[in-house]
Regions:
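Conserved small/polar residues in nucleotide/adenosyl-binding loops
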Residues: 169-175
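N-terminal glycine-rich phosphate/adenylate-binding segment common to multiple enzyme folds
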Residues: 74-140
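Short, glycine-/small-residue-rich phosphate/pyrophosphate-handling segment
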Residues: 135-168
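Residues at the starts of beta-strands that form the adenosine-phosphate
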Residues: 22, 46-47
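Short internal beta-strands
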Residues: 47-54
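Short, glycine-rich nucleotide/cofactor-binding loops
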Residues: 19-33, 146-159
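Positively charged, low-complexity intrinsically disordered leader regions
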Residues: 1-12
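Histidine-anchored nucleotide/phosphate-binding helix
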Residues: 31-43
Length: 178
């Protein structure tokens, strides 16, 4: 497989897999989230569990266009919606957890719950952002912007291995520059 160096190549790669990822979206009732959902549906790369207030979610035009790829789970309370989305991902009902219009700290509370959350014991929470700059020849990866303000050496090692796993295993990037 050729190295993936742009979002267009990443999208083409995901389309070739011929498998839609299932994404659990917490409180998907805002324009930015709706836009992201619509784009993923148009590209044929995802299906969605939209967890939130069904009175709002059922008004989405996207729902009418792609009813077979969207399921709404009615939960009005955002904290409860976050807990339900985390449960669904933890139990394998979705591949990816996506944040809609919910406070980040509320979502993190559900993710980090020691008994019912997503973080395995002894592991760290980190993130990896991928950016495409049109005038640059490849994708750029940024790890852990402010998630762990003062990481220990062991935490840094785990962050680096996570970045390597995503960028080289899943995106087959040709060289490692960390």
């Amino acid at each position: 497989m050729e190295p993936i160096q742009s979002f267009a190549q990443l999208t083409a790669h995901l389309k070739k897999l011929n498998h839609r990822k299932r994404i659990a979206v917490v409180c998907a009732n805002d324009p930015n989230t709706e836009y992201a959902i619509t784009r993923a549906l148009e590209e044929g790369i995802a299906e969605f569990l939209m967890i939130g207030d069904s009175a709002i979610l059922e008004k989405y035009p996207t729902l009418k266009q792609y009813p077979e790829y969207i399921k709404i789970i009615h939960i009005e309370d955002s904290d409860e919606a976050a807990r339900e989305a985390v449960r669904i991902v933890r139990e394998g009902g979705a591949d990816i957890l996506m944040k809609g219009i919910i406070n980040t700290d509320n979502l993190l509370h559900a993710i980090l719950d020691k008994e019912k959350g997503l973080l395995p014991k002894g592991k760290i929470l980190t993130h990896l952002a991928v950016m495409e700059i049109p005038t640059y020849h490849k994708l750029l990866f940024f790890s852990d912007a402010a998630v762990i303000p003062r990481p220990t050496l062991q935490q840094r090692i785990e962050m680096i291995w996570y970045a390597i796993s995503v960028s080289y295993t899943h995106l087959t990037l040709p060289t490692k520059r960390i």
